[in-house]
C-alpha cells in the first residue's frame, strides 16, 4: 500500500462505517413508516426520499472501498489517486450529513422514534 497516514486510513474506514450506519438508518426509517402507515399518497414522497438517501450513501461507500483497495494494490499510488481519496472522504461526509438531516426530518414528521 502506498504509505497513507494512519489518520487518513482511520478517517476513511470510520466514514465507511458511518455511511453503512446511515444506509441502515434510512432503510429502518423507511421500513418503520411503511409498517406504520403503508404506501399511500401521503407516504409515497417520504418513502422515496428515504430510499434516495440510502442510495446516495451507497456510492461514497463503494468509492471509498474501491479507492482504498486500489491504493493498496498500486505501488506506488499516484498523487491523482490520493487526491481522489481525499475528495471522496469530503464528498462522503457531505452526503452523510445531508442524508442524516433527511432521515431525521422524516422521523420527526412521521413520529418515528
Question: Which residues does each PLM region occupy?
Answer:
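Short, charged/polar, low-complexity loop and linker segments
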Residues: 1-6, 30-45, 72-83
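N-terminal leader/targeting helix
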Residues: 1-20
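Amphipathic, heptad-repeat alpha-helices with coiled-coil/zipper character that mediate oligomerization
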Residues: 14-28, 48-69, 95-98
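Leucine-rich amphipathic alpha-helices with coiled-coil/heptad-repeat character
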Residues: 33, 61-64, 68-71, 75, ...
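Amphipathic alpha-helical binding modules
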Residues: 78-113
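Residue-identity detector for glutamine
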Residues: 16, 36, 49-51, 75, ...
